C-alpha cells in the first residue's frame, strides 16, 4: 500500500519497521533510513518512508534506499533524458556574484539555477570562504534545494580544492578560514606516518561533511622530481614509496575506510594521472608555456607507483594531468603527445586496463576550452590576465571535438565547464553513442548513492560552527605542525631558554612574548636572532593568469633578497636561527654557513614554532626531498627522476634528532 505525504523540511527519525522488505529476498526487519527533504514529497510504502523525487506518487527503484547503489543508479539512468545525462557529466564552478573563480561568501543562486535546472548540472566545485562555516553550510543547502526541485531530484555533489593548510592559491587551494590548519602535505610526508595522515584526512572529511562538501579534489600523488615546479608544496615529496604510503593513508581517511565509499565518505579524487611532476624547466602546465612534462629517460613507472596506494585504498576518483608527456614511452612505444585528459592509452589502457581503476575519471579544469592569442603569449602590459583553456596537444581541434576525444579517451566528467549541449549534439550527430554516456553517468550517480546524498543532501548548518575547526582537532594539527619541523643544523643553540632576548624577522612579537621571550629592537641587544623566510622564487610570467600567481624560477637566495639581508646582518652580530618554509626545495648553501640552527618547515604558526624551539624533545621529521647545493646542480637534474641532484647539500631523508 502506498500513501503520499506533503513535502517538509524536517528529518524523518530512524525507526524499525516490522514488515518484510518489498524488494529484498530476505524477510527481515529493516531500519528506516533518515531522510532530509525541502522540495521532494514523502511517500509511505508498507510502513516505510521514501522520498518521491520524481513526484509520480510511486516508489521507483532509484528512490528505494533499501536497494544497492548500482541497482539504483542503473534505474535512474534508464529514466533520464539525453540532456540530463550530458549535464551529469559536467562539473561546474558554483557561481558567486562578481568573481570569475567563484570566490565569496554567497552563491549567485540565479546563475546556479540556470546551471542546475536548464543545463542539468549537479556537480560543482565550491570556492566559498570558510570564515563562516554555518553560512557556508546553508549556502550549500541552497544548491541542494535547487537540485532537489529538478525533474528527477538528483542531488548535487559539492567538491573543493584543499583548504586545511597555509597555502592559498586560486585553482590549487582555498584559504583555511575556520577549518583546522595543518602543515602542507609535505609536512605530513616529513613525519612519514601513514596513520597520522589517515587521522588528518578523517578530520578533514568530517569538517567537509559538516558544511555539505562530499568530494575532495585531493590528494596529489605527483612526484616532485623537478625542484623548480610550483606545485611541489601540494605533494608528498619525491620518493615513490613514501608518497604511495601517504596517499593510501589520505584516501583511507577521506573516504572513511579502505573498502570504497559509504554514507560518511568524502570522495577522494587523486591527481594528477600521471607524470605531472616531471615539469619541463619547472614550468606548470596550467600555462601554455608549461604544457610539457619531460621524460628524458623511460621513467614513467616512478610516477605511476604512488597511485597504487590510491588503488589499494579504493580511491573513487582520478584526475588526469594537463601535461603532455614529452618523449615518454611505455615498453618502448611512444605515448601520444596530448594532455592526459585526451590520452586513451593513459586513461583506458593503463589506468582502467592495467591498474583496474573502476571509479570516476574527472578531467582537470577547462581542458576543452580554447587557448589562443594572449592565452599563448600573455597579455599586454597593463592588461589583466584571465583564465582560459588548457587543451594541450589538441589546440587545433574545436571544443566539440575535444569533448569527443576526451570521452573516447575515458573521461567521465569535465571539470570547470557546464556546456552540456555539446555532448548532446555529439550524440545526435552520431559522433558519440548514448550508451557511452550511460557508462559515465552510471559511475557518477553510483557515487552519489554510495555517499548518501539521495537520502540526506542537506546538513545542519547550526552544527557546522561546532564541528569545523574543533579545539581538539586544532591541537592535533598544531602538534603535527611541530612534528613536521626538520632540523637541518644545530650548533649548540637548541633548545632555547625562556627569558632569552630575541631579535625577530618575520615572526610576530606578541607570539614571542607569549612564548616567554623578551623581544629587542636590534640584533646587538639579543641573545639570539630568530628569522623566518621561505624558498626564494621568481615570477617571470606575470602576464599569464596562473603564471602571475605561481612561484617559479631560481631556488637560491640572492644578495638583494630582504630575508637574506636580514640573515647576513643578524648572523654577523648574534647567534642566528633560521627556519625556511619549504614550498619548493631551497638552495641553502649561502645560508647554512651563517646560521647556528637551521630548520625546514612546511607550514607552522609562530606560536607553535616558538614553543617547539623551547622544547627539549627530539626532532624526528625527515626531508621529503633533497635540497640541492646550487642552481647549477638543479639545471643538470633529470626532470623525471627523484633524488638525482649532484652532491645535494641535504639528501632526501635527512634530519637531525637534536
Name each model feature, range by range.
Residues 2-15:
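Bacterial N-terminal signal peptides that target proteins for export
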Residues 24-25:
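N-terminal signal peptide c-region/cleavage motif recognized by signal peptidases
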Residues 29-47, 53, 210, 367-371, ...:
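C-terminal non-catalytic regions of proteins with extracellular/luminal or membrane-system context
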Residues 167-173, 227-232, 278-285, 328-333, ...:
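Short acidic, glycine/serine/threonine-rich loops at helix termini
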Residues 233-235, 329-344, 375, 471, ...:
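Short glycine/threonine-rich loop-to-helix capping motif typified by GTGT followed
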Residues 273, 280-300:
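Binuclear metal-dependent hydrolase catalytic cores centered on His/Asp/Glu-rich metal-binding motifs
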Amino acid at each position: 500500500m502506498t500513501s503520499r505525504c506533503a513535502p517538509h523540511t524536517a528529518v524523518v527519525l530512524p525507526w524499525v519497521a516490522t514488515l518484510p522488505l518489498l524488494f529484498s529476498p530476505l524477510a527481515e526487519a529493516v531500519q528506516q533510513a533518515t531522510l532530509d527533504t525541502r522540495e521532494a514529497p514523502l511517500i509511505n510504502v508498507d510502513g516505510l518512508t521514501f522520498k518521491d523525487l520524481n513526484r509520480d506518487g510511486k516508489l521507483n527503484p532509484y528512490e528505494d534506499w533499501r536497494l544497492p547503489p548500482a541497482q539504483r543508479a542503473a534505474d535512474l539512468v534508464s529514466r533520464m533524458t539525453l540532456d540530463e545525462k550530458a549535464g551529469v557529466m559536467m562539473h561546474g564552478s558554483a557561481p558567486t556574484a562578481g568573481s570569475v573563480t567563484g570566490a565569496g561568501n554567497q552563491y549567485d543562486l540565479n546563475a546556479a539555477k540556470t546551471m542546475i535546472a536548464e543545463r542539468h548540472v549537479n556537480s560543482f566545485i565550491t570556492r566559498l570562504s570558510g570564515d563562516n562555516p554555518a553560512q557556508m553550510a546553508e549556502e550549500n543547502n541552497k544548491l541542494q534545494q535547487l537540485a532537489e526541485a529538478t525533474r528527477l531530484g538528483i542531488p548535487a555533489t559539492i567538491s573543493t580544492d584543499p583548504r586545511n593548510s597555509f597555502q592559498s592559491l586560486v585553482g590549487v587551494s582555498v584559504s583555511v578560514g575556520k577549518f583546522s590548519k595543518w602543515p602542507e602535505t609535505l609536512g605530513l610526508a616529513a613525519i612519514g606516518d601513514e596513520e597520522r595522515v589517515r587521522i588528518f584526512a578523517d578530520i578533514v572529511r568530517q569538517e567537509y561533511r559538516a558544511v555539505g562538501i562530499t568530494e575532495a579534489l585531493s590528494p596529489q600523488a605527483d612526484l616532485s622530481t623537478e625542484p623548480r615546479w610550483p606545485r611541489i608544496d601540494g605533494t608528498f615529496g619525491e620518493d615513490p614509496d613514501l608518497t604511495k604510503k601517504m596517499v593510501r593513508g589520505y584516501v583511507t581517511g577521506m573516504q572513511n575506510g579502505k573498502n570504497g565509499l559509504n554514507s560518511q565518505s568524502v570522495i577522494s579524487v587523486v591527481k594528477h594521472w600521471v607524470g605531472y611532476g616531471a615539469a619541463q624547466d619547472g614550468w606548470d602546465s596550467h600555462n601554455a608555456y608549461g604544457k610539457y612534462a619531460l621524460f628524458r629517460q623511460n621513467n614513467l613507472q616512478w610516477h605511476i607507483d604512488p597511485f597504487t596506494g590510491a588503488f589499494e585504498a579504493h580511491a573513487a576518483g582520478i584526475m588526469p594531468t594537463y601535461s603532455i608527456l614529452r618523449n615518454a614511452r611505455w615498453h618502448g612505444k611512444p605515448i601520444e603527445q596530448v594532455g592526459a585528459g585526451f590520452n586513451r592509452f593513459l586513461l583506458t589502457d593503463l589506468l582502467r586496463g592495467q591498474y583496474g581503476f573502476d571509479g570516476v575519471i574527472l578531467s582537470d579544469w577547462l581542458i576543452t576550452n580554447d587557448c589562443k592569442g594572449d592565452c599563448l603569449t600573455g597579455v599586454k602590459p597593463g592588461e589583466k590576465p584571465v583564465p582560459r583553456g588548457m587543451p594541450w596537444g589538441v589546440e587545433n581541434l574545436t571544443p566539440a571535438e575535444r569533448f569527443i576525444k576526451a570521452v573516447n579517451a575515458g573521461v567521465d566528467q569535465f571539470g570547470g565547464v557546464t556546456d552540456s549541449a555539446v555532448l548532446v549534439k555529439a550524440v545526435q550527430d552520431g559522433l558519440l553513442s548514448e550508451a557511452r554516456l550511460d557508462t559515465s553517468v552510471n559511475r557518477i550517480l553510483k557515487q552519489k548513492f554510495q555517499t548518501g546524498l539521495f537520502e540526506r543532501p542537506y546538513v545542519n548548518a547550526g552544527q557546522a560552527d561546532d564541528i569545523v575547526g574543533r579545539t581538539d582537532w586544532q591541537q592535533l594539527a598544531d602538534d603535527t605542525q611541530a612534528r613536521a619541523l626538520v632540523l637541518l643544523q644545530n650548533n649548540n643553540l637548541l633548545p632555547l631558554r625562556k627569558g632569552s632576548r630575541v631579535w625577530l624577522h618575520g615572526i610576530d612579537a606578541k607570539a614571542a612574548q607569549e612564548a616567554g621571550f623578551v623581544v629587542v629592537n636590534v640584533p646587538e641587544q639579543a641573545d639570539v636572532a630568530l628569522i623566518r623566510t621561505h624558498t626564494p622564487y621568481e615570477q617571470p610570467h606575470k602576464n599569464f593568469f596562473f603564471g602571475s600567481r605561481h612561484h617559479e624560477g631560481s631556488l637560491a637566495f640572492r644578495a638583494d633578497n630582504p630575508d637574506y639581508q636580514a640573515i647576513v646582518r643578524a648572523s654577523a652580530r648574534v647567534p642566528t636561527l633560521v627556519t625556511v618554509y619549504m614550498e619548493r626545495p631551497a638552495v641553502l648553501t649561502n645560508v647554512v654557513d651563517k646560521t647556528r640552527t637551521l630548520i625546514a618547515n612546511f607550514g607552522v604558526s609562530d606560536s607553535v614554532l616558538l614553543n617547539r624551539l623551547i622544547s627539549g624533545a627530539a626532532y624526528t621529521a625527515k626531508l621529503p626531498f633533497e635540497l640541492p647545493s646550487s642552481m647549477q646542480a638543479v639545471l643538470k637534474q633529470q626532470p623525471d627522476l627523484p633524488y638525482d641532484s649532484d652532491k645535494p647539500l641535504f639528501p632526501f631523508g635527512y634530519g637531525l634528532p637534536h
